[in-house]
From Swiss-Prot:
InterPro entries: Chorismate_synth, Chorismate_synth_AroC_sf, Chorismate_synthase_CS. This is Chorismate synthase. Its cofactor is FMNH2. Its EC number is 4.2.3.5. The lineage of its organism: Bacteria, Pseudomonadati, Pseudomonadota, Gammaproteobacteria, Pasteurellales. Belongs to the chorismate synthase family. This reaction introduces a second double bond into the aromatic ring system.
Amino acid sequence: MAGNTIGQLFQVTTFGESHGIALGCIVDGVPPGLSLSEADIQPDLDRRKPGTSRYTTPRREDDEVQILSGVFEGKTTGTSIGMIIKNADQRSQDYGDIKDRFRPGHADFTYQQKYGIRDYRGGGRSSARETAMRVAAGAIAKKYLREHFGVEVRGFLAQIGDVAIAPQVIEQIDWQQVNSNPFFCPDPSAVEKFDELIRQLKKEGDSIGAKLTVVAENVPVGLGEPVFDRLDADLAHALMGINAVKAVEIGDGFAVVNQRGSAHRDEMTPEGFLSNHAGGILGGISSGQPIVATIALKPTSSITIPGRSVNLANEPVEVITKGRHDPCVGIRAVPIAEAMVAIVLLDHLLRHKAQNR
């Protein structure tokens, strides 16, 4: 199974399944001398981990990361950093009914067709549980970006279903507000509506989609390798690799369809840009403006409402998903999206430095 590694100079490889013994990753390319311990990584994992609020899956995992290699006396050595997170709260018996059935909307059918075998327990490798290791690797990238380049990578939830934050809130994000509520939302009025919507969905046994935005500030000019490794192309690749993501926007994204060139172009003065419709990337290269990326996540198919499907023998069956699941996967996806953006940015920064010494 290929496709488990991302990056060229800053490279992350993950392994593990939802109900396996542990999850793990290997991070290559971290420069030597970075102060690093589990305490630097754990806060981001705590933001992603399940069971932290009534709005997410009740599965409880401590998600305590353990660094196995690549750090000596509190400093990175420049060698591979190995990390693991042990799984503790698996309930594999919840998935016995789908051993021979395909859950509609999930990767069950495609994994079975591609590999001829699948770990049906919690989705196995296709589960979003795997993203814990992306967050761990991303925490290292965020720390290096912040300490060595002053780059800040932060995200917020912009919409759940038809409830969206106010446009004026987006213009001036209050990051303290984002970190003060379980929705990672900068709009207090939207938080209340999110709460009502999620409560109703849990009663109905249904789920809902979401939209979230990641902003990277203080990114230097010049990152990106046209034409095939454009910065926006690599960001889109990384973000589309997150479970349940169905669309990626850079800057104004799909809204550009209704814009005119006279309005969309980011005009410049000696003092700088007058707008940022391009989301901080021009011609596939960072412009020095904040990089803005938005993703849309589908409603999870893990719901208790019966659905039609087929089994291994291609016979019609009814599927009712058991187990513990998020009514909106977009909530816990905020730190995951931050991690993927940070991984791409650090990789491109290292590539840019290597090319322009």
